Amino acid sequence: MNVGDSVRRALDNWDRRAWGAAVLHAGNAVDGTAKKRYPQLGVATRFKRTIRDSLDIFHIMTAPGIDFDQTRFPVAVNSDLSDKRPDIADVLYGIHRCGHDHESELPNGFELTPHGPRTASVHIWRDGKIQLPASVALGLVAVAVFATENKGEVIPGDYRLSWYQHVFQISGWWGWQDHFREIISVAQFSQVTLDFTESWESWTPL
């Protein structure tokens, strides 16, 4: 399946409030993008690197108040970072890798908070489950849509992303990463590095 189809399916499921399916299809869009950008790398490495390349875009569309660059998550996923403490790219690859066995639901250990008016947040429960905002689907879609490798992808004209007063018709915004970054550069958000001190005490690296 190509990137355009994956983005379309992600947003169709988003509109139906089928959050799990939206995230899984959005992950497929990032996977397709990563394959174009880093064809010589393995699936896990290229998927994570593509997210880290565009962490500013993912962050602004997912949860502007969370510092995803510095936050680490004490959950049971593999990390390729030197200290083995998973970052958001590791967590999202954990969903993507296991999600191929689930057509519409996230794999065990991952939950989503339905999208709504409350500020997006992340929780880690005592049983080790991580609860992410459903808006991670929009963050992943944005990473794919604005990636320069995806200029020329095709999607019907009524699909769009929005950020405050800005509306981005996806059919005309494929690959316009630099321009999107210019638009969001005016944003001023206070970012918080999430503190999971208690959960780290019982965490062990994979």
Q: Which residues does each PLM region occupy?
A:
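Short, contiguous, well-structured surface segments enriched in hydrophobic/aromatic residues
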Residues: 25-71
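Charged alpha-helical initiation segments
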Residues: 1-24, 28, 41
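Long, charged low-complexity segments
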Residues: 53-177
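Hydrophobic/aromatic-lined pockets within catalytic cores
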Residues: 15-18, 34-38, 101, 105
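Hydrophobic core segments within long, regular secondary-structure runs in both alpha-
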Residues: 4-7, 48, 94, 98
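Sequence termini and other peripheral, non-core segments
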Residues: 156-206
